[in-house]
Amino acid sequence: VYALDGEVVLPLADLEKIFGVTAVLSEDHTSLRVDASEQALLESGESYYGARDVYWLSHIINAEAGNQPMDGQIAVGNVVLNRVADERFPNSVKEVVFDRRGGVAQFSPTADGRISLTPDEDAELAAKLAFEGYDPVGESLYFINHSACNASWFNSRLTYTATIGDHVFYA
């Protein structure tokens, strides 16, 4: 899985394997025939995460990264999920999103009200992709908008992992 011009792309061979189908490209490369005679039974990813978690994750993604490329939106979701999995942080999506460690909102949209904005379809897709394991930033637990924040504290104390769009990610 990778991103291309802000879109999530999955190689055809992987799709064939996942769905248990065979895809045949026409000789002139203008059409694709899919043989689903041996269709695999896939359980929806939504059976592994709840609507409430998608709700809060898509809201924070929209508020923090709604103007960023899809990889950047997914990466913000990854930071939240990485925190949920890390014993140093709260253990639910909502608790991580609204965490006020040291009396300071860990995600500014919870302090300024942007968390209440309705997420668009991209933010919801990014949340679901993050839940389903697409992860462009590895073990990142923090991110900043480098155009709106001085990175010196982050650079001196944390390990840089990636830059996507306007955000710099750290572990």
Where are these regions (language model features)?
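Bacterial extracytoplasmic/cell-wall-associated proteins, especially those involved in peptidoglycan
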Residues: 43-171
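Primary recognition of N-terminal secretory signal peptides and signal-anchoring hydrophobic helices
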Residues: 1-58
